[in-house]
Amino acid sequence: MTDAEKKVLDEEVVVESVDVEVGTMEDVDAIMKKFDRESNTRVWEGTPKKILRYVLAAFMLFMVYMNLWATWSGQIRRCLFVGFVILFTFFIYPVKKGNVKPNSMPWYDILLAVAGCIPYFYYVANFKRIVAMGIAIGQTEVILGIIGTLVLAECCRRAVGLPILIVAGCFVLYAFIGRGMSMDLVVYNIFYTTNGIIGTPISVCSTYIALFLLFGAFLEATGVANFFIDCANALVGWASGGPAKVAVVSSALCGMVSGSSVGNTVTTGSVTIPMMKRTGYPPEFAGAVEAASSTGGQIMPPIMGAAAFIMAEMTGYEYADIIVRAILPAFLYFLGIFLGVHFKAKKLGLVGLKREELPKWKLLLPKIYLLLPLIVLTWMVVAGQTMAKSAIYGTIVAIVVGIINKDDRMTPSKFVNGLENGGKNCLSIGIACGIAGIISVCITMTGLGGKLITYVVKLSGGNLFIALFLTMICCIILGMGVPTTANYIIMASTCAPILINGMSMHILAANMFVFYFGIVADITPVSYTHLTLPTS
């Protein structure tokens, strides 16, 4: 082959790869809408879109006010949060996938939105009286509690998906059928106590998680995700099988700020998967690498899919201690994937990308200021500042960075977008936390947790490794298709006590163990979402 022919061939390959990548980026929204329940939203246009946008932005500002200056009791804060989340969920998520008629919201959705938030606002308005009633709640409170719970379940079906709802339904049925509890008692525990819907998960979600979601929205607006991908390309793109290594490194970096393994998969996979296929990796291997890497982003400090905040509440350990201790397991996870793709590349004889195709460090280093928000956040947390204060200061720094970023400057419109995205992100996580609270209280009030401990200890014969294996199986089964935050709450309520109380395992080690294997459920074949996205 002559030099001229080689040059033509190289140009054809480059053009083909660019077409694939552009096509993939154009198809991202379609892929997300097809496989990710959270991405199937209503289509609002014109004035209704603007109104909803500013309402969500105002909701996020209200959350900031409530966390920094309001002096209301915990139950009032949580009920207000859940009430608004339910109200906005019906305006964002249609009754089924594919409902794309612009500016359309059927009457029954409006009815459900109003009916769903009324019980929570009723709780706020009658807070002192309801607390004084204790377990002897009246029929009005029982009916409102049932409505509030059922509408929350419908919100979960729309915004989160069926898996966690099915799990919660099984636990509620066990309370009625397995333990013979009355309707009044179940409703009281689920709806009116601080162990149920407005329990610890919602408490953490309405405070720390909401503020960190706001931080993440503004950090994303600075373009830091693209910076991470460019850095990963420059760092390992030239190595043997470079694109797969880029997928691993970029997923780890993006995972530091991402709260969604699906979102992480699409953000990095839309760039790395076409490159992996072009280099010579089999399509199924490319998809598997991206799915495993992006899922691992949920165990990457400091955000850890927002589960780290709830772990701090449930274990009593400082948030800073948790993220420091999570560094080594996260490093080992990604090291294992990195070595796997390296050996696969050597086996297939794959080479890396050409140096001239990769981003230049001299162009990337001037953009290192994009990391300032993350650095400030981590420094404040490790220095012992409160999580709320750290998140707010990190958000302020992210806004400043966005303003001085010449390549993607923060405009007033982008500022409102950041608030809007923060509000939207609160919806699915808030709903998942509410449903997880139902699961948690059912386990507590039925005594099911004690039975699980007894069964596992008997089956394991007191052997820790067998108990760990059995607990791992439980985590993978219960964690399939469940969002990260709710996933951890379920694991901490059902599986962690097995190791802590049954096998005398260290509380933090047990919680880390069940959290990691609950996350691994995302790449278990039955849980198809995270596997289907990258191969699409």
Give, region by region, the residue ranges found by the protein language model.
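Membrane-interfacial loop-to-helix junctions in multi-pass transporters
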Residues: Q139-I143, N195-Y208, A234-V248, T279-F285, ...
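Membrane-embedded helical hairpins/re-entrant loop segments and their flanking transmembrane helices
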Residues: F212-N264, T268-P283, L452
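Membrane-interfacial helix-loop connectors
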Residues: T267-T279, F309-V324, L459-G461, C475-V520, ...
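Alpha-helical transmembrane segments of multi-pass membrane proteins
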Residues: Y208-I209, D230, G241-G255, Y281-T295, ...
